[in-house]
Structures are given as C-alpha cells and as structure tokens.
C-alpha cells in the first residue's frame, strides 16, 4: 500500500478537521435524541472544522513542512477475505469495549446520584462551564462527552437529557460545544502517536467550542431584542 507523502503541517490540519468532524452519522443521531436537530449539529461541526483549519493553517510555521515518513510503517496489502475477517474481529472487540464503558458509566452515574455526588462535582467545574458558555445544569453531560466522547457517553447524555430540566437553548449550546470539542483524552492521543504537536490537537478545537457557544448566545440575545 502506498503511503501518502504528507507533511507534518498537512497531517496536523487533517487531524484538527477529523477531531471536530468524525463519526457524524452516529453522533448526530445521539445528539438528535438529546436536544438538537442532527442536521444542525452536523452543519455546526463541519463549519467549525473548516474555519478552525483555515485559522490554524495561518499559524503553522514553515519548519513543520518535513515529510512524515520516519517511524510510520506502511500497511501490507491484505486479501479481501482476511481484511473482512480482521474488520469483524475489530468491530466485535469495539462493541464489547463500548458496552463495558457504557455500563460502567451508567453504574457510576447511579452511584453518584444515590450519594448526591453529582452536585459537588458540577460545582467544582462550574468555572470551566462558565468559561465554556454553558449552564451549570448541563455539567454532568458535558463531563461525559468531554472525557468519554459522544458515542461512549451516549447513554449518560441521552438519559440525563430526558430526565433533566433543561430548556432547548441550554441543550443546543451544550451540543454545539461537545460536537466541536469532545473525547479530549482518547481522540487526540491517537494522533500523538504520529508525532504531531499536542498543542494543535487540544487548544484550537477547545477555543473554537468556546467561541461558537458565545457567538450562539450573542445571536440569540440579538434575535430576542
């Protein structure tokens, strides 16, 4: 299989785009079940991806243009049947992983509710939520998406959105934020293995999420005048 001769700059821009806009169908369905229209959520993410990549491209220095070939092995071509078998095995393990994570999250959430821990956790992160432009009430949903991602945190997000006393605008702001900036641990770590700068994997989409929510809030205020 031929390896594309991408530079570190190009890989960084691709990573930034993918970190914001990936798994759009599945995550769009999850977001639709918990407070925002899927097309609206997807459109926000795609626009945010394009704008963020354009801005990041302005800041990348020319000395990042070395082609990334060292340390990256080429994948050997596989027969179709073998490839299909490997895909089924990988998908099976992924399903088990998702099931275990979701079950663990639901059990943890139940324990936290029983001992009234959620209120204390949300209160601790309230300054972060305020900076993100989010209401403190959506704190547990934001934590689930930011740490575990929309897909893995789906059960918590959907369940809490249905049970919680959230208004439409609060949920829309939440989904704009987590749509752009979620799975802050696992997803960027995948690109770190390619030798990309950690700053560009975390900071741009975090700032984009903050800016997007505040602009959305401002637009609603102007609209209500």
PLM regions and their residue ranges:
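Transmembrane alpha-helix boundary/anchor motif
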Residues: 25, 29, 103-107, 112, ...
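Juxtamembrane and boundary regions of transmembrane helices in multi-pass small-molecule transporters
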Residues: 4-8, 19, 28-74, 189-225
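Hydrophobic alpha-helical transmembrane segments of multi-pass membrane proteins
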Residues: 17, 43, 91-95, 108-112, ...
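Alpha-helical membrane segments and immediately flanking helix-loop junctions
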Residues: 1-34, 132-191
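Hydrophobic alpha-helical transmembrane segments
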Residues: 1, 38-48, 86-89, 115-126, ...
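Selected transmembrane alpha-helices and immediately adjacent juxtamembrane segments
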Residues: 46-129, 207, 211, 224-225
């Amino acid at each position: 299989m031929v390896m594309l001769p991408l530079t570190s700059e190009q890989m960084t821009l691709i990573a930034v785009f993918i970190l914001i806009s990936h798994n759009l169908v599945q995550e769009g369905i999850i977001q639709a079940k918990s407070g925002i229209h899927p097309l609206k959520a997807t459109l926000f993410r795609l626009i945010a991806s394009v704008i963020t990549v354009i801005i990041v491209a302005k800041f990348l220095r020319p000395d990042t243009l070395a082609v990334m070939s060292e340390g990256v092995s080429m994948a050997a071509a596989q027969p179709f049947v073998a490839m299909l078998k490997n895909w089924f095995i990988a998908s099976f393990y992924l399903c088990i992983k998702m099931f275990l994570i979701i079950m663990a999250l639901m059990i943890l959430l139940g324990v936290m509710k029983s001992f009234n821990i959620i209120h204390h956790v949300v209160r601790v992160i309230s300054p972060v939520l305020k900076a993100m432009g989010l209401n403190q009430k959506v704190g547990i949903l934001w934590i689930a998406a930011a740490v575990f991602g929309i897909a893995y945190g789906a059960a918590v997000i959907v369940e809490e959105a249905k049970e919680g006393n959230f208004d439409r605008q609060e949920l829309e702001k939440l989904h704009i934020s987590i749509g752009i900036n979620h799975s802050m641990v696992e997803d960027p770590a995948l690109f770190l293995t390619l030798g990309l700068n950690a700053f560009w994997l975390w900071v741009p989409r975090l700032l984009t999420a903050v800016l997007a929510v505040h602009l959305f809030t401002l637009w609603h205020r102007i609209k209500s005048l």
